[in-house]
Amino acid sequence: LKMSLLYTDNMVLQRDVPLTVQGIANAGDRVTVSIADRQMKTKAGLNGKWSVTLPPLKAGGPYTLKISTDETGFQYQNVLAGEVWLCSGQSNMEFMLKQASTARADIPRAVDQQLRLYDMKARWRTNAVEWEANVLDSLNHLQYYKDTEWKNCTPATASDFSAIAYYFGKMLRDSLNVPVGLICNAVGGSPTEAWVDRASLEYQFPAILKDWTKNDFIQEWVRGRAALNIKKSANSQQRHPYEPCYLYESGIRPLEQYPIRGVIWYQGESNAHNWEAHEKLFKLLVNSWRKNWNDACLPFYYVQLSSLNRPSWPWFRESQRRMLNEISHIGMAVSSDHGDSLDVHPTCKKPVGERLARWALNKTYQKNVIPSGPLFRGANVRGGKVFLSFDYGKGMRSSDGKPLQCFEVAEYDGIYYPATAEVVGDQVKVYSKEVPNPRYVRYGWQPFTRANLI
């Protein structure tokens, strides 16, 4: 009898959905699964695989989940039913609570028996080193993540857990008052394409699979780091965590059919060189994961890249904003006001995690919470001035009490000039004496921006 590594003591099962439990036994073995007052029996198929679907559980517990055959069995203790979220992406999602600017104040208070953490950490970080033969062999067998187990939230466990995921989960706990389980499998430096399933890329983006270590669709830094890590390999098919599909195969497929409520995602730094390719990849990513969980409406809330002195980032952030209108059941947390001009890893993570939680509370849980700051809806021109309207624009103001800044306007020639911007009711009026016939407006269009509209 063999179960997914997600099945451990202290696990959280998704409430209010049919509860699929599956595993592997000897062909023909009778398998019994029971939890609370529910029990189901089935027989393992010729390939040993078996699956049962139990009626939904309400939030609560603790329960004991029992899975047995005639010869052997497992008992998982202290199991809760609640809300399960996957927290994924690259290093800013991986960034630990103990590294955050709020660590000293918040770690001692991180005590919650009903917040459970499943922390999938990499066995080998993708640092600037050449990996040895045993590492390279393990990678070829998709053995990239350390074995782990569900743990109660304590100062010790929260300290090494994702800061953004922790603050997201804490806000859900405080608002919903039900158990919350967080699964984190983020990998520093990982590009979007590593998280997409192979069939999707083969059919819809085959060019990115071709000779990936020399492929211009893939960021030069990503290719360079991978080439260094696998330098000692003589295997022309040597695998690496940054390879297209690799993290899907090693970090997402093992979670298949473990019911979750939704996903939070912070990634893009390793794709910011090519926003057009990323737009295509991001849509494939969302669809890939929705297929994996057989849920076309799986909520997917993501972080817009922060502020940093890299020229391509305004284009990338704008592309991420457009995705809000092109994919269903998603939301975007802005982070540019908490950036660091010189560090790709800003330490202020609490507001970002809580902004993701606001999207979940509003859209997934139908709570009366404003999910976002102002989001551009439309514009009209009157008398040489542009009037911008916004979703979530009630009570707009500047974040620092100073005049609005970082607005620019241009005529048809596309030459932008700094503009004056003022809140007028539920609109923002933008104008410049240098631009009598404005055609375009942009806002926060600096790699590191001090834009201040909230």
What function would you assign to each model-found segment?
Residues 1-454:
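Cell-envelope and extracellular/periplasmic
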